[in-house]
From Swiss-Prot:
Binds 1 Fe(2+) ion per subunit. It comes from the Bacteria. Required for the formation of a threonylcarbamoyl group on adenosine at position 37 (t(6)A37) in tRNAs that read codons beginning with adenine. Is involved in the transfer of the threonylcarbamoyl moiety of threonylcarbamoyl-AMP (TC-AMP) to the N6 group of A37, together with TsaE and TsaB. TsaD likely plays a direct catalytic role in this reaction. NCBIfam families: gcp_kae1, T6A_TsaD_YgjD. InterPro entries: ATPase_NBD (IPR043129), Gcp-like_dom (IPR000905), KAE1/TsaD (IPR017861), TsaD (IPR022450). One of its GO terms (biological process) is tRNA threonylcarbamoyladenosine modification. This is tRNA N6-adenosine threonylcarbamoyltransferase.
Length: 320
């Protein structure tokens, strides 16, 4: 089914994003974050994030409509993040989308936030990184963010199966907790990646083993935080050595798990689809590109939560 003008709304966590697509191309994306507010708490406070979304949603929508040179009655379909996410935050987009859909007499379609991330490399904003033919099924979908770290079997847009996921902390969450302990500004992932030096990436031993038996990062996180607490005020503490050793350990472990999935699948996967906030990490991207499978990665502006990915995934479902 074809819809000329599609509105997208994303509000699953601390970002509020509005996007508009015309004729299957994203023409505007407006994303606003409340991360500066949450920085005082070292993490996202759901009630504060939801209130922030409510306060700026109308203004952000008007900005998007103005940039797209549209009036609101030109919208043919509304897409919004339905799950997963923070319930208070999800509620904002759901109520707004369904109310607006009722008033305009147009459909409102809820979209899975994680599947939006999986297909985010394929977002077409007039300067698409890849051709649709670059995505060959079956694909391996990878989501790595502050809330989720998971690996999926992607047979088609509507046939996605979870293969493996962390038992506890997502990688992005560990980055933020480590960054907070080091006094880095929230969210800390980008700063840690910026400080990363491969020549100093094996100088700190957080654990007595270089392998984790389970797909779990809570124990490793505790070990890193314990090391920081004991050493950060020492005169010989080296920040670059600490963050480089941390990043190499956790990304290498994740890459090994991806390799295990690929090997067990007997090389059936033709493409890797990478999405989520941590997908912008330079070391993760470089390691994935070393694999013998074509890896599709999103533009940095689409690696975090955004409404363009919600529209994009909805379009893939509609075009099946």
């Amino acid at each position: 089914m074809y819809y000329k003008v599609i509105l997208g709304i994303e509000s699953s966590c601390d970002d509020l994003s509005i996007a508009i697509a015309i004729d299957n191309k994203i023409v505007t994306t407006k994303t606003k974050s409340s991360s500066s507010v949450h920085a005082n708490y070292g993490g996202v406070v759901p009630e504060i994030a939801a209130r922030y979304h409510e306060e700026i949603l109308h203004q952000t929508l008007n900005e998007a409509l103005t940039e797209a040179n549209l009036t609101i009655n030109k919208i043919d379909l509304i897409t919004y993040t339905e799950n997963p996410g923070l319930l208070n935050c999800l509620h904002v987009a759901k109520v707004f989308a369904n109310t607006l859909g009722y008033l305009l007499k147009i459909p409102a379609q809820g979209i899975n936030h994680l599947y939006g991330h999986i297909f985010s490399p394929m977002i077409d904003d007039g300067d698409c990184l890849y051709q649709k033919s670059d995505l060959i099924y079956p694909a391996l979908g990878i989501v790595v963010s502050g809330g989720h770290t998971a690996i999926y079997d992607v047979q088609s847009p509507s046939k996605i199966t979870l293969l493996d996921e962390t038992l506890d902390d997502a990688i992005g969450e560990v980055y933020d907790k480590v960054g907070r302990a080091l006094g880095l500004q929230y969210p800390a992932g980008a700063k840690i990646d910026q400080l990363y030096n491969p020549e100093q990436a094996e100088t700190v031993e957080f654990l007595k083993t270089n392998k984790l038996s389970a797909f779990s990062y809570s124990g490793f996180k505790s070990a890193v935080l314990r090391y920081i607490e004991l050493n950060k005020n020492q005169p010989d503490f080296n920040l670059v050595q600490a963050v480089s050793s941390f990043q190499k350990f956790i990304i290498d472990d994740f890459i090994d798990r991806i390799k295990n999935v690929i090997n067990k699948a007997d090389s059936k996967y033709q493409t890797i689809l990478l999405g989520g906030g941590v997908s912008a990490n330079s070391y993760l991207r470089s390691e994935l590109k070393e694999l013998a499978i074509k890896t599709l990665v999103p533009k940095p502006i689409y690696s975090g939560d955004n409404a363009a990915m919600i529209i994009n995934y909805a379009q893939y479902l509609l075009n099946e």
